[in-house]
Amino acid sequence: MSASVESDQPFRQSGWRTVRLSAANAEGGAPTEVQISPALGCNLLSFVVNGTDYIVAGDLEQEPRVLGSPILYPTPNRVHDGQMSFDGRPFAFQPNMGPHFIHGLVRDQLWQLDPPCTDGDRACLTARIAFAPGDPIYDLFPIANTLQVTYTVTPGAVRMDWLVRNDDATQRLPFGLAIHPYFPIIGPR
C-alpha cells in the first residue's frame, strides 16, 4: 500500500489549484483521493472512494459557492443583523444573507500550508489561517487567533483534525466551527 501527494493540481474545468492526497486501495482497486483548495478557504472539493465522488462539485459558473465542504469559522451560523457581542464587546459583520451574516470569514480566504506528508498508506496536509494584526481578516474579527486543520487520507476515508488557538492573552475568543459539506444523492431516492 502507498500514499501520495500532488500539489498544484487543477480542479476540473475551474482552473482552481488544489492539493491532491491519495491512498492506494489494499485490494488493488481505485485509490481514495481528495482535492483541497488552499485559496478557496481550504475547501475539500472532492472525496473519491472506489471511483465515486462523495462531494458535490457544484455548478462552477452558476453557483460557485455551493460546492465541496467549506469551512465555516468563527461564526458558522447566522449572526442576527450582522451584530453580536461577547464579554461586553460588540462585533459587527457585513450582512451577506439579507440583513444577517452567515458562514464566517474563512471560506474564501487563502490558507497557509505545511509541507504535505505520506507515511505508509496515509497522506496528510496541515493548513492554517491566522487572524493577526495587520491582516485584513483581523480587521473583521480583531482577536488574534489561529485556525488549523489537518486532512488525513487513508484507504476509504478522510479525517479532519482541528486546532483553534487564542493568540491574544488579554481576551477570550468567541468562536464556532463547522463544515458545510454538499453531498450528492447516490442511487435511487
Put a short name on every predicted segment.
Residues 1-189:
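Surface-exposed acidic/polar loop and edge beta-strand patches at domain peripheries
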